[in-house]
A protein has these predicted regions:
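C-terminal transmembrane helical hairpin of 12-TM major facilitator-type secondary transporters
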Residues: 278-323
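Extracytoplasmic gate region of multi-pass secondary transporters
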Residues: 25-26, 213-262, 324
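Helix-loop-helix hairpin linking two adjacent transmembrane segments in secondary transporters
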Residues: 136, 140-182
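Juxtamembrane intracellular "pre-TM" segments in multi-pass secondary transporters
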Residues: 1, 187-218
Length: 407
């Protein structure tokens, strides 16, 4: 097996278990909230806690990795740490205890994605970068974190307790840390694309904001992280409390999100390599409106609802493009992990922290429909902003350059 392929799968599965642990609290929340008497506002704050520290750790962890070039060591330490934090979540017995453990987990998990994506970016050929980074970020995280997690964790919680579910969730990360030690190499930094020119080699990270794609990706990441976190946090409650599905039905419907994202982790980035980043981001972000729209207004069978949600969750396939591929093709190679940490960090702070906290507050005062309206609005905003992206896909740039060279 080629090293490039092995790297993608080791890091992709590792990130899958990152999301298995991150999403565990959402899928177990109906059990936790009943046991610890949480309000909707407290549910939103629990979802926000991890996003806040994830964002800060993602930026500073990525910047530290760029400065020291010790990406592998940082990755191994972070994976071991988040696994231990899952065990701590299992012993929490109050809102404050669980809130604190989720803050710690965010610190541990934050550096993993920017460091992993920088490793993949360095090892990927130009024509495969979007595909490789999409598979690394979305396939494992959604197959394990969104598809398998609700089925496994809800079943464990029903058979035992939610505490035991957290204990079990922490084990796979320790195994993946061993795989990283064995199979991942420290990369040799090289230019990623036409933007990686020697003239920019000495620029400060603040200079990144002069690139239009960087600040557009930051704002779109805020919108799409909010879109995703609102779905994770409030769909389980809406399914059970408003649509009156059983916990088992809820877990199956939530697992559809993982199946969709795993499937479209190949489709969306692959299409972007051929059709262009901008076109694909616009189209699939708009499709993201289908998820809240179907849950709010579709009255057919649960099977038909699952099909609509499967289609709508394809918008998750744009996340690695916004948070990885487009910034990495815009910024010089030596700043890739820092750039990705900036985009992911801002998305997590404002989208992952602010949106669920605000949604929980409005749900307590109005209804559980409000978070889903917010989710739809986020998808529309992201699609509108994508209209202004500067195309970075190497294949599209080559096609544009060919007529000029022929003249």
């Amino acid at each position: 097996m080629k090293y490039e392929t092995r790297l993608i799968w080791v890091l992709g599965i590792t990130f899958g278990f990152v999301f298995f642990d991150r999403n565990a609290v959402n899928f177990l929340m109906p059990f936790i909230a009943k046991d610890l008497a949480f309000t909707n506002s407290e549910v939103g704050l629990i979802a926000s806690a991890l996003s806040f520290t994830w964002a800060i750790a993602g930026f500073f962890g990525g910047a530290y990795a760029d400065r020291t070039a010790h990406r592998k060591k940082i990755l191994v330490a972070a994976v071991i740490a988040f696994s231990l934090c899952s065990f701590l979540s299992g012993i929490a017995g109050s809102f404050l205890a669980l809130f604190a453990t989720r803050l710690l987990m965010g610190v541990a998990e934050g550096p993993i994605l920017p460091v992993s994506q920088s490793l993949v970016a360095f090892e990927s050929a130009d024509g495969q970068r979007g595909y490789n980074m999409g598979v690394m970020q979305n396939f494992g995280s959604n197959l394990l974190g969104s598809f398998a997690a609700p089925l496994i964790l809800v079943a464990i919680a029903k058979a035992s307790t939610w505490h035991v579910a957290f204990f079990i969730a922490g084990i796979p990360g320790l195994i993946m840390a061993a795989f990283i030690i064995k199979f991942v190499k420290e990369p040799k930094v090289h230019a990623l694309g036409p933007s990686s020119r020697p003239a920019h080699a000495g620029m400060h990270w603040t200079e990144m904001l002069k690139f239009r794609n960087m600040w557009l990706c930051m704002i779109m990441s805020i919108a799409m992280v909010a879109w995703m976190v609102l779905g994770w946090a409030f769909l389980p409650f809406y399914y059970i409390n408003v649509k009156h599905y059983s916990p088992g039905q809820m877990s199956v419907l939530m697992s559809v999100l993982g199946l969709s994202a795993a499937f479209f982790s190949f489709v969306v980035p692959g299409l972007s390599d051929r059709l262009g980043r901008r076109t694909v981001v616009i189209a699939f972000n708009l499709i993201g409106v289908v998820v809240p729209g179907a849950v709010l207004y579709f009255d057919g069978s649960a099977y038909a609802l699952a099909a609509l949600v499967f289609l709508g969750w394809s918008a998750s396939g744009t996340m690695p493009l916004l948070m990885g591929t487009i910034p990495s093709e815009t910024i010089p190679a030596r700043y890739v992990a820092t750039a990705l940490g900036m985009v992911m960090g801002l998305g997590e702070v404002l989208g992952g922290v602010g949106a669920p906290a605000l949604a929980g507050w409005t749900a307590d005062r109005y209804s559980l429909q409000v978070p889903l309206y917010m989710q739809a609005g986020c998808a529309v905003i992201a699609a509108a902003l994508a209209l202004f992206l500067v195309e970075t896909a190497p294949a599209r740039l080559a096609n544009r350059a060919a007529p000029a060279l022929a003249q």
